[in-house]
């Protein structure tokens, strides 16, 4: 959605066709119910600053990088609102404070060191640290309600957001579909990708009728979430050799009790649980979804072999295994047994056990106020790194062929939050001529004023 809209603004003469397997748009991991909507800015996610160094400090370079990238997303979306590409911004972004919360003496010292490192940078100058329960109760009363004695601490920054990535995606795609030379086709699955002398032949099957057609394109972008890896493998490009995918399912606890929901106005991230992947670090989130304020806790990870929540099949993982990635996937199983056991345990635990995890954040939680829902599926990119197979990559990665005729996005966190920065990477690499001209540069500056600046 972001790439199509940005390319069309850079060069209105471009013809752009989008295909979506689902009947609706942005129904998988982008949908508001299928992700945390944090607007990852590095403010509260402790997994980006996982440990203290030998001198007691905490490295904050990663959170600074993510914050800068998310600023680019907000700039582009602001441009979209101002230029009638996305109306009613409160339908997709709302201000919500971001809080990091820890308990235990060691973690309190860690958070204090994290705050010292982050608040020294101008991005996070407004961040506040406290160990005072009265102060914390004024920030997020559910965290203190019913809590026993013991060291606790939190940081808070009011500049955080809650983002409905599905809503902004659908708004941008709606605008794109109305532009000359552009089309949006949902209910269409790509079943073939073959290189030709001028670019690519894309075979597409319409789900409702079974009709198959072939389109030709000079450039193809694969941004299909968990469905990206099979399409990338289908392309046959050398850059896809050895790549694998490791799907991780997700579930939320959701509370619609208005009395409880109104007590909480923050996104609260906690400490990573043992063996948990980064996208499964627990958090208690205020969400604005479908015009309604609600409260989500999770995510709880789960074992799955599907690559997509709605359009996926249980054969996705086995069918993705090829001779060139078999050793990588085997090594994932061997060297990440704790992770595999964790996923199986998470997916089979009882509601009582889930509520016990929730009580780490909200000690007074009652099971009757919460229900379990399924969330999206994250497919982690797996590849060989430094000669060692079986490394799970929890970030996002753009794979581009040598001819710059096809790009694909793999990975998850921080994902949608830095989508505009990812789009910039694709444009710089695959469409350099669009930025080389004075006119193109000016158009990009209008969309993202800091795109060529280092604001760190």
Predicted regions and their residues:
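Short beta-strand to alpha-helix junction loop
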Residues: 61, 65-73, 102-109, 155-177, ...
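Flavin (FAD/FMN) cofactor-binding and adjacent substrate-gating region
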Residues: 87-96, 101-179, 183-185, 193-198, ...
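C-terminal catalytic lobe of FAD-dependent flavoproteins
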Residues: 150-159, 167, 309-436
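Flavin (primarily FAD) binding-site architecture
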Residues: 222-238
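Dinucleotide-binding Rossmann-like beta1-alpha1 core, especially the glycine-rich loop
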Residues: 37-138, 294, 304-306, 312-315
């Amino acid at each position: 959605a972001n790439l199509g809209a940005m390319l069309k603004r850079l060069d209105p003469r471009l013809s752009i066709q989008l295909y979506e397997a689902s009947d609706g748009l942005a129904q998988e991991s982008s949908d508001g119910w299928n992700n945390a909507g944090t607007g990852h800015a590095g403010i509260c996610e402790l997994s980006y600053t996982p440990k203290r160094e030998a001198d007691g400090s905490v490295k904050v370079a990663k959170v600074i990088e993510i914050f800068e990238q998310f600023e680019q997303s907000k700039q582009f979306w602001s441009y979209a609102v101002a230029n009638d590409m996305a109306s009613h911004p409160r339908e997709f972004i709302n201000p919500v404070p971001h809080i990091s919360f820890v308990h235990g003496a060691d973690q309190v010292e860690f958070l204090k060191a994290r705050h010292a490192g982050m608040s020294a940078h101008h991005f996070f100058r407004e961040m506040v640290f406290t160990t005072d329960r009265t102060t914390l109760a004024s920030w997020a009363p559910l965290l203190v309600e019913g809590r026993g004695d013991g060291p606790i601490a939190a940081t808070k920054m009011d500049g955080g957001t809650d983002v409905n990535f599905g809503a902004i995606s659908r708004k941008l795609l709606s605008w794109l579909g109305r532009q000359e030379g552009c089309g949006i086709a949902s209910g269409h699955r790509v079943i073939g990708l073959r290189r030709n002398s001028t670019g690519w032949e894309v075979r597409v099957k319409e789900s409702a009728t079974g009709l198959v057609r072939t389109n030709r394109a000079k450039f193809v972008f694969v941004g299909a979430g968990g469905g990206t890896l099979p399409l990338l493998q289908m392309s046959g490009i050398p850059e896809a050799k050895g790549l694998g995918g490791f799907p991780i399912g997700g579930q939320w606890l959701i509370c619609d009790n208005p009395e409880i929901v109104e007590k909480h106005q923050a996104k609260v991230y906690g400490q990573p649980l043992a063996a948990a992947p980064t996208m499964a670090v627990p958090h208690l989130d205020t969400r604005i979804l479908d015009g309604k304020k609600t409260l989500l806790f999770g995510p709880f990870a789960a074992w799955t072999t599907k690559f997509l929540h709605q359009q996926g099949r249980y054969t996705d993982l086995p069918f993705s295994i090829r001779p060139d990635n078999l050793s990588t996937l085997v090594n994932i199983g061997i060297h990440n047994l704790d992770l595999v056991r964790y996923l199986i345990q998470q997916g089979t635990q009882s509601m009582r056990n889930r509520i016990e995890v929730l009580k780490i954040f909200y000690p007074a939680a009652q099971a009757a106020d919460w229900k379990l829902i399924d969330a999206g599926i994250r497919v982690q990119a797996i590849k060989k790194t430094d000669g060692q197979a079986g490394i799970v990559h929890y970030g996002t990665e753009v794979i581009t062929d040598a001819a710059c005729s096809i790009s694909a996005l793999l990975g998850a966190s921080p994902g949608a939050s830095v989508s505009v920065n990812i789009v910039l990477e694709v444009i710089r690499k695959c469409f350099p001529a669009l930025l080389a001209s004075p006119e193109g540069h000016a158009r990009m500056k209008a969309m993202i004023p800091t795109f060529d600046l280092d604001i760190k």
